[in-house]
């Protein structure tokens, strides 16, 4: 956290904030203060974006490049397993190995998502 003190404006960190951990919802396990306020208190430029949105992430990195005198942290508010009917928002995927049937469904979900973007 000393990067803010030293004004390391060539440093960019990214926090994957999916609100899940191996044992469940992070808020159920331990109350989380505002990530944004915490980083800002240490002198960081804070950008909070929808982390599953590539355009938003690219834009955040562009903004970070132009921030002078402070390091930047991007809080990427993500959905774990986004786009997969099998995995989305399920904490057990921190450690679970998919079955062949689950892999098939995951690939189908991703193919459908890819087609929708075309």
Task: Describe every region a protein language model picked out.
Residues 1-118:
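Glycine-rich ThDP/TPP pyrophosphate-binding loop and its adjacent helix/strand module
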């Amino acid at each position: 956290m000393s990067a803010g003190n030293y004004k390391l404006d060539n440093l960019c960190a990214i926090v994957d904030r999916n609100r899940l951990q191996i044992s469940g919802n992070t808020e159920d396990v331990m109350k989380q203060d505002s990530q944004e306020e915490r980083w800002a208190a240490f002198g960081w430029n804070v950008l909070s974006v929808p982390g599953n949105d590539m355009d938003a992430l690219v834009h955040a990195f562009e903004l970070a490049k132009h921030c002078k005198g402070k390091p930047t942290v991007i809080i990427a508010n993500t959905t774990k397993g986004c786009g997969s009917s099998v995995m989305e928002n399920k904490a057990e995927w921190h450690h679970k190995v998919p079955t062949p049937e689950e892999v098939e469904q995951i690939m189908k979900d991703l193919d459908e998502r890819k087609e929708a973007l075309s």
